[in-house]
C-alpha cells in the first residue's frame, strides 16, 4: 500500500468526486455522491474506490465501515454513458487482441475496486435505500452485512444490457442467497423488493425508511467497533478464508470470458438503446 494511502490524508473528501468520507468513534462512513445520476458508477468511482478502502484497511483508528448512497437511491450501477468510451474500441468490427487486452485490463481494474471492499479487514455494513442496480449489487455483495429500507429495490440488471456481470455478483451472491435465487436474478434481470431481499438473505433486516436503515447500519458498526479490533479482524480472516480462492477464480474466469465474448451486436444495440432511451431488440448476434 502506498504511503499516501496509509496516511489520514485519504480521509479528505475534497480530493474525491464520487465519495464523501467521515470518521468518528472508530467508524468510517463513506457515502456515494455520484457525480452521475443515482450515484451511478463512472470513472471517478472506479479510480477512487481502491485508495479509500485501502485507507480504511490500513488506518488503525477505523474499526468498522458504513457505506450508503446519497439522495434517494443507493446506486443505479455502472454509468454506461460515462463509460461508453471504454467500450467503443472493443466493439469495433475489427477489434482484435489489442482492444480486447485493454478491455480485459479495464475489467480487472474495476474488479479490484469491488475487491478492495471485500478484502478490507474492517467489517463493512451497507445501508441500501431506493434502487440498487447492477454494479450496486456487486458493491453490496462485497460488504459483510447489509440492511435496507422498505423502499429498496434490487436488480442484477447486466443481462438486460447484454453484459455478463463481471464485478463479483456471480461469484459472491451464491454464498449469500444460494444458487437458485442467484440464477433467477442473474438470468432474468428482474427487480426484487426489500421484503424478498430479506427473505432470501440478501439483506439482514428491513427498516421503515432510509433514515432508520442508516441508523441501524451505524449502530451495527458501532457494536463491531466496540469489540477487540484484532479479534474482529481474525474473525473476518477465518470467515473469508474458504471463499477467497473460489471468488478469485470466478473473477479471473469472467474477466477472460467477457474480454473474448462480450463484444457483440447485441451489446452495441444495448448501448444504443440506453442513449436513445428505448427498449433494445436483441438478435443473438
Predicted feature residues:
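Glycine- (often His-adjacent) and acidic-residue-rich active-site loop
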Residues: 37, 69-113, 246
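Conserved CoA-thioester-binding segment of acyl-CoA-metabolizing enzymes
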Residues: 1-70
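C-terminal long alpha-helix characteristic of the crotonase
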Residues: 147-152, 203-252, 281-285
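Acidic, divalent-metal-coordinating active-site segment for phosphoryl/phosphodiester hydrolysis
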Residues: 189-196
Amino acid at each position: 500500500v502506498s504511503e499516501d494511502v496509509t496516511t489520514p490524508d485519504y480521509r479528505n473528501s475534497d480530493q474525491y468526486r464520487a465519495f464523501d468520507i467521515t470518521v468518528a468513534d472508530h467508524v468510517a462512513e463513506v457515502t456515494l455522491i455520484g457525480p452521475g445520476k443515482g450515484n451511478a458508477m463512472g470513472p471517478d468511482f472506479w479510480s477512487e474506490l481502491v485508495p479509500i478502502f485501502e485507507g480504511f484497511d490500513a488506518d488503525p483508528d477505523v474499526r468498522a465501515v458504513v457505506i450508503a448512497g446519497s439522495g434517494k437511491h443507493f446506486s443505479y450501477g455502472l454509468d454506461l454513458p460515462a463509460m461508453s468510451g471504454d467500450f467503443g474500441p472493443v466493439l469495433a468490427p475489427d477489434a482484435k487482441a489489442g482492444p480486447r487486452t485493454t478491455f480485459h485490463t479495464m475489467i480487472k481494474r474495476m474488479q479490484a475496486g469491488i475487491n478492495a471492499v471485500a478484502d478490507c479487514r474492517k467489517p463493512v455494513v451497507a445501508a441500501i435505500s431506493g434502487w440498487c442496480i447492477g454494479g450496486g449489487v456487486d458493491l453490496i455483495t462485497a460488504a459483510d452485512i447489509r440492511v435496507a429500507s422498505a423502499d429498496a429495490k434490487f436488480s442484477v440488471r447486466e443481462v438486460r444490457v447484454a453484459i455478463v456481470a463481471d464485478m463479483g455478483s456471480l461469484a459472491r451472491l451464491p454464498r449469500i442467497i444460494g444458487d437458485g435465487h442467484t440464477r433467477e436474478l442473474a438470468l432474468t434481470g428482474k427487480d426484487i423488493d426489500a421484503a424478498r431481499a430479506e427473505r432470501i438473505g440478501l439483506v439482514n433486516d428491513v427498516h421503515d425508511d432510509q433514515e432508520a436503515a442508516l441508523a441501524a447500519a451505524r449502530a451495527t458498526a458501532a457494536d463491531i467497533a466496540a469489540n477487540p479490533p484484532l479479534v474482529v479482524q481474525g474473525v473476518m480472516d477465518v470467515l473469508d478464508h474458504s471463499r477467497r480462492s473460489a471468488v478469485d477464480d470466478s473473477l479471473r474466469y469472467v474477466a477472460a470470458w467477457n474480454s473474448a465474448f462480450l463484444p457483440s451486436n447485441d451489446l452495441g444495440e444495448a448501448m444504443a438503446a440506453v442513449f436513445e432511451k428505448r427498449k433494445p431488440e436483441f438478435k443473438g448476434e
